[in-house]
C-alpha cells in the first residue's frame, strides 16, 4: 500500500485503485485524495473501468453513493466495480459487491429509420427502435419496446454490456467487437429477451428479472 493510503495501477481493462481507509481521518479526506490522484491521468482514464478495492464496512452506504457519483462526474469513468478488501491480511478477497454501470441517457420517443444515437454510457429507450435506425452505447442498451434496427452496446470494448428489449428483432446486434445478424423468417418469442456475450459468442435468452438484479 502507498504511504498516502491510495495505490493506483493501470491494467488492460482500465484502472485498479486500492484504498486503506485506516490512513484517513474521514471519508472526505479519502475522496479528495483519490480524485486528486485520478485527476492527474484524467485524459487516459476517461471512459474506462475502475476496480476499487476497499474495506466497504468502513464506508457508510450514503458515502459509497457519493463516491460513485463524484468519480463519474470528476473523472468521467464508464464503470466502477467495488471489491471488498480484507484489511487485516492486506489481501484482496474476491467478493463481488456490485457494478455501478455509469451514466444513463433516457430517450422517451421512437428512434426512426435514418436516425442514429450515440452515448458514452447506457441508453434506455422508452419507445421502439425502427428498422434502419442505429443505436450505439459504451454501456448497456435497454429498449422498452421493439428493437428492429442496428445496435452496438459496449462500443468501447466492454463485453460485459448487455442489450435487452421487450421485442428483440435487430437487423444487426453487436456487443463490443462481437457481432450477430438476425436470420430472416425466424419467428420471435413475444416476451422480453436479453443478449450478452458468453464464451466469445452472443447468446439471447429470456429476461428473468431476478437473475439480473
Curated annotation (Swiss-Prot):
Pfam family, one: MinC_N_1
Keyword Ligase: no
Keyword Cell cycle: yes
Annotated GO biological process: cell morphogenesis; division septum assembly; regulation of cell septum assembly
NCBIfam families: PRK00513.1-6 (NF001775)
Similarity comment: family membership: Belongs to the MinC family.
Designated name of the protein: Probable septum site-determining protein MinC
Quaternary structure (record): Interacts with MinD and FtsZ.
Keyword set, alphabetical order: Cell cycle, Cell division, Septation
Function noted in UniProt: Cell division inhibitor that blocks the formation of polar Z ring septums. Rapidly oscillates between the poles of the cell to destabilize FtsZ filaments that have formed before they mature into polar Z rings. Prevents FtsZ polymerization.
The organism's place on the tree of life at top rank: Bacteria
Amino acid at each position: 500500500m502507498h504511504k498516502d493510503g491510495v495505490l493506483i495501477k493501470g491494467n488492460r481493462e482500465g484502472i485498479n485503485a486500492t484504498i486503506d481507509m485506516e490512513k484517513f481521518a474521514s471519508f472526505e479526506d479519502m475522496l479528495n485524495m483519490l480524485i486528486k490522484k485520478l485527476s492527474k491521468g484524467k485524459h487516459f482514464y476517461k471512459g474506462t473501468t475502475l476496480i476499487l478495492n476497499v474495506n466497504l464496512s468502513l464506508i457508510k452506504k450514503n458515502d459509497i453513493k457519493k463516491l460513485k457519483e463524484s468519480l463519474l462526474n470528476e473523472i468521467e469513468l464508464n464503470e466502477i466495480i467495488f471489491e471488498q478488501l480484507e484489511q487485516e491480511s492486506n489481501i484482496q478477497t474476491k467478493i463481488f459487491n456490485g457494478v455501478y454501470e455509469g451514466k444513463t441517457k433516457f430517450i422517451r420517443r421512437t428512434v426512426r429509420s435514418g436516425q442514429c444515437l450515440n452515448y458514452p454510457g447506457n441508453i434506455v429507450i422508452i419507445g421502439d427502435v425502427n428498422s434502419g435506425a442505429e443505436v450505439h452505447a459504451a454501456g448497456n442498451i435497454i429498449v422498452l419496446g421493439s428493437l428492429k434496427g442496428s445496435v452496438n452496446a459496449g462500443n468501447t470494448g466492454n463485453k460485459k454490456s448487455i442489450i435487452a428489449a421487450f421485442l428483440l428483432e435487430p437487423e444487426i446486434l453487436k456487443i463490443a467487437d462481437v457481432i450477430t445478424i438476425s436470420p430472416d423468417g425466424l419467428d420471435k418469442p413475444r416476451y422480453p429477451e436479453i443478449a450478452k456475450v458468453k464464451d466469445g459468442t452472443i447468446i439471447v435468452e429470456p429476461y428473468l428479472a431476478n437473475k439480473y438484479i
